[in-house]
Design a protein with these regions (language model features):
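Post-signal peptide N-terminal regions of Sec-secreted extracellular proteins
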Residues: 25-132
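N-terminal prepro-regions of secreted/extracellular proteins
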Residues: 1-41
């Protein structure tokens, strides 16, 4: 009987020590859409991870007559003095790509999408959108 109580107590202590405090729980993933242009579908997400943020940007070339699609996200500090960027391209109808960035700049996130011609010139670009 004492052995059972000792095992139960040890199990309870192990479980209590193994759980994370509420402050260490992962924050939710926030999805966003990037304003599109003809033939381009773009989207992304961000998630706070402690003192940093993980930004993911995805793009899909969705039209046969669009040669390539691109999307970019810029994460700034609160004063717009420093930034990190993540960009992604997809070439060919139906192709999709995603890229991620972990940055310490938590102030603002701005995203934009564009489509391009075969010669590398920009065909159309969306209006930049402030996510936060």
């Amino acid at each position: 009987m004492l052995r059972r109580i000792a095992v139960i107590a040890a199990s309870a202590v192990t479980l209590a020590c193994g759980t994370l405090p509420a402050s260490a729980a992962a924050s939710p993933v926030h999805a966003f859409g990037i304003p599109g242009v003809y033939g381009v579908r773009a989207w992304g997400s961000y998630q706070h991870t402690g003192a940093k943020i993980r930004v993911t940007v995805c793009v899909k070339d969705a039209a046969r007559d669009v040669y390539g699609a691109a999307a970019a996200g810029l994460a700034f500090d609160s004063g717009y003095r420093h930034h990190d960027d993540v960009s992604v391209t997809a070439i060919g109808d139906g192709h999709m790509q995603c890229r991620a960035l972990v940055t310490r700049y938590l102030g603002h996130l701005v995203v934009e999408a564009l489509s391009g011609y075969r010669n590398g010139k920009v065909r159309h670009h969306s209006t930049p959108e402030w996510i936060y």
